[in-house]
């Protein structure tokens, strides 16, 4: 779909080759973790308390929009606890045996990180309950009348679950997490610090004003900020001498069709469709998806959250409505 081509899509498979670079510039410790002050302060206390008691950290659920650093935070927790981390995702764990294999290979106080935990199958989820509560694994041996259940003791461990859809988790699973952290969109100042740190890690010559220009257009999302930084770097190396100032960053981002608000053509297409085709709304999700040629899930999970958070779009019981701010942005009269 169109989503796969978006430079500012928080989750874009076209850029997976750059994950190696992303891992290299990710912070490893809480002290280097920019933004999300409330999360950082709380996790520092929880981690130190667990270390003082020589216990595994309580199970942790991290949720929020894509690209805000859920995986980064999970790795930071493991680094701070000085334990191993094993990483998987909900869709990968198709059978109970897949989860059992991971759990039985954990060492004491290790971290098991499950991304997209809301996509766990009910069968796998059932196995997870006693593992989280009692550090025990219930396994069925054999089939039919001869089948029997055996219990395997597990070492104390920390399950970290990450999701963009906390509401999709079942109540029994959600209630078993002792710590819940929501990641919010980042402030521009925090994103500027992230961009500057990434530039330093990549050995780039970048002025603070250049980092600020990238941060302003990154939709409050570190993953997008780092992706834009790499494209600005390309522009600076080809069109200039490699040095990134505000003017170079502005020209590069304009060339990439990312405007001052961080909108790309899909954001503009969505808002303009509501204003021009549906009289500003309200318009239902099905009609909007058909009008712009995009999947409903992509509209709900990727396009809309930032537009709503910035005050350009409203969700109402009757449908989506373009706000006065959207009309002002495009210079269109209501």
Swiss-Prot record:
Keyword annotations from UniProtKB, A to Z: ATP-binding, Cytoplasm, DNA damage, DNA recombination, DNA repair, DNA-binding, Hydrolase, Nucleotide-binding
EC number: 3.6.4.-
Record-listed Mg(2+) binding positions: 71
InterPro entries linked: AAA+_ATPase (IPR003593), AAA_lid_4 (IPR041445), DNA_helicase_Holl-junc_RuvB (IPR004605), P-loop_NTPase (IPR027417), RuvB-like_N (IPR008824), RuvB_C (IPR008823), WH-like_DNA-bd_sf (IPR036388), WH_DNA-bd_sf (IPR036390)
Any single biological process term in GO: DNA recombination
Presence of keyword Protein transport: no
Enzyme class: hydrolase
Positions of region (Head domain (RuvB-H)): 260-334
Localisation: Cytoplasm
Annotated DNA binding sites: 315, 320
One Gene Ontology cellular component annotation held by this UniProt entry: cytoplasm
Record's function text: The RuvA-RuvB-RuvC complex processes Holliday junction (HJ) DNA during genetic recombination and DNA repair, while the RuvA-RuvB complex plays an important role in the rescue of blocked DNA replication forks via replication fork reversal (RFR). RuvA specifically binds to HJ cruciform DNA, conferring on it an open structure. The RuvB hexamer acts as an ATP-dependent pump, pulling dsDNA into and through the RuvAB complex. RuvB forms 2 homohexamers on either side of HJ DNA bound by 1 or 2 RuvA tetramers; 4 subunits per hexamer contact DNA at a time.
Subunit structure: Homohexamer. Forms an RuvA(8)-RuvB(12)-Holliday junction (HJ) complex. HJ DNA is sandwiched between 2 RuvA tetramers; dsDNA enters through RuvA and exits via RuvB. An RuvB hexamer assembles on each DNA strand where it exits the tetramer. Each RuvB hexamer is contacted by two RuvA subunits (via domain III) on 2 adjacent RuvB subunits; this complex drives branch migration. In the full resolvosome a probable DNA-RuvA(4)-RuvB(12)-RuvC(2) complex forms which resolves the HJ.
Similarity annotation: Belongs to the RuvB family.
Protein name, per record: Holliday junction branch migration complex subunit RuvB
Source organism per UniProt: Vibrio parahaemolyticus serotype O3:K6 (strain RIMD 2210633)
Lineage: Bacteria, Pseudomonadati, Pseudomonadota, Gammaproteobacteria, Vibrionales
């Amino acid at each position: 779909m169109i989503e796969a081509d978006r430079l500012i899509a928080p989750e874009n498979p076209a850029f997976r080759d750059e994950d190696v670079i992303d891992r290299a510039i990710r912070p490893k410790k809480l002290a280097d973790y920019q933004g999300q002050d409330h999360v950082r302060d709380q996790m520092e206390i929880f981690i130190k308390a667990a270390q003082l008691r020589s216990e595994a950290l309580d199970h942790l659920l991290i949720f929020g929009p894509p690209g805000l650093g859920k995986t980064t935070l999970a790795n930071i927790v493991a680094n701070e606890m000085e334990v191993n981390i094993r990483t998987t995702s909900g869709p990968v764990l198709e059978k109970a045996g897949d989860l059992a294999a991971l759990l039985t290979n954990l060492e004491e106080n290790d971290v098991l990180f499950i991304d997209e935990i809301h996509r766990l199958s009910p069968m796998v989820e059932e196995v997870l309950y006693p593992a989280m509560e009692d550090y025990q694994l219930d396994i069925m041996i054999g089939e039919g009348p001869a089948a029997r259940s055996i219990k395997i003791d597990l070492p104390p461990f920390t399950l970290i679950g990450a999701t963009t859809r906390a509401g999709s988790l079942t109540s029994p699973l959600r209630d078993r997490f002792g710590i819940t952290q929501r990641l919010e969109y980042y402030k521009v100042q925090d994103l500027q610090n992230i961009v500057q740190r990434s530039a330093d890690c990549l050995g780039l010559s970048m002025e603070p004003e250049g980092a600020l220009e990238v941060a302003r257009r990154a939709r409050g999302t570190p993953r997008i900020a780092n992706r834009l930084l790499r494209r600005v770097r390309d522009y600076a190396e080809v069109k200039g001498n490699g040095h990134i100032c505000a003017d170079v960053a502005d020209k590069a981002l304009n060339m990439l069709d990312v405007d001052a608000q961080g909108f790309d053509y899909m954001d503009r297409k969505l808002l303009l469709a509501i204003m021009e085709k549906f009289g500003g709304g309200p318009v239902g999700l099905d009609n909007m998806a058909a009008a712009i040629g995009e999947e409903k899930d992509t509209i709900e999970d990727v396009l809309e959250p930032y537009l709503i958070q910035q005050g350009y779009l409203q969700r109402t019981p009757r449908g989506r409505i373009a706000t006065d701010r959207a009309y002002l942005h495009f210079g269109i009269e209501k």
